[in-house]
């Protein structure tokens, strides 16, 4: 807890160096009207709708296995107990931290649109592989790698949505992006009966396969906006 608190304090202190911006003119509008306008704006732009759809998919089909279902996996699959659960959670989030540091260092010339697609596809593939794993050591390695790849999906995804939005719409667009988390409780709600009915391994295979196919469909359907190297979404990512 002390380390987490220290990170929050450090983040706050670093935020003090962010350049200020002149206040925008006040605009009186109903919050629901703003939300509807944001959804309509995202719906009209493939370079926003694609990332939003992918964000919803990873919440629906990928995050459940490293969040709500991880205690089940630790107990029923790895027979690891409380300590094993801690190791599993730490493996994923340590990988995510390492990936975030690599992305944030801006040492790699990432094409953000392509990066979020290929890393999303690898992430869903890792869900399938994790479901087939019954060895704790291999599970830890897979979770670390998954967390690492996860950062190459989520961070560029946010960059694409910010870059593709007009300045006056960025706040509302990112608000819509946050609503993608609604996929997580839905994914968890569906996973319970599926695991009871068809088993854990089949459920991970189903979730991972659906996510992988949907990611490929996003990349193909909106390839001009997200995959082509000339697309604005693939301008050099500066971290």
Task: Pin down the residues of each PLM region.
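A generic secondary-structure micro-motif detector
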Residues: 28, 60, 180-181
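C-terminal transmembrane bundle of multi-pass solute transporters/carriers
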Residues: 1-9, 13, 36, 43, ...
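Conserved beta/loop motifs at nucleotide-recognition and modification sites
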Residues: 11, 18-19
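Short helix-kink/termination motifs in transmembrane helices of multi-pass secondary transporters
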Residues: 51-52, 60-73, 156
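Juxtamembrane intracellular "pre-TM" segments in multi-pass secondary transporters
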Residues: 20-53, 237-239
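Pair of pore-lining "gating" transmembrane helices in MFS-fold secondary transporters
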Residues: 44-63, 144
């Amino acid at each position: 807890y002390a380390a987490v608190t220290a990170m929050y304090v450090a983040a706050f202190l670093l935020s003090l160096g962010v350049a200020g911006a002149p206040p925008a003119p006040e605009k009186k509008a109903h919050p629901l009207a703003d939300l509807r306008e944001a959804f309509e704006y995202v719906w009209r732009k493939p370079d926003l709708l694609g990332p939003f759809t992918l964000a919803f998919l990873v919440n629906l089909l990928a995050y459940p296995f490293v969040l709500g279902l991880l205690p089940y996996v630790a107990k029923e699959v790895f027979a690891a107990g409380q300590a094993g659960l801690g190791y599993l959670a730490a493996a994923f989030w340590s990988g995510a931290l390492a990936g975030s540091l690599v992305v944030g260092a801006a040492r790699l010339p990432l094409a953000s649109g392509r990066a979020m697609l290929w890393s999303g596809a690898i992430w869903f593939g890792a869900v399938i592989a994790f479901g087939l794993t019954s060895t704790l050591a291999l599970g830890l390695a897979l979770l670390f790698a998954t967390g690492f790849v996860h950062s190459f999906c989520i961070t560029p995804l946010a960059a694409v949505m910010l870059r593709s939005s007009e300045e006056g719409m960025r706040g509302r667009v990112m608000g819509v992006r946050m609503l993608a988390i609604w996929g997580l409780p839905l994914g968890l709600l569906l996973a319970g009966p599926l695991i009871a009915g068809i088993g854990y391994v089949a459920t991970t295979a189903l979730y991972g396969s659906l996510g992988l196919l949907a990611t490929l469909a996003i990349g193909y359907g909106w390839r001009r906006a997200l995959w082509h190297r000339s697309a604005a979404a693939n301008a050099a990512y500066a971290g």
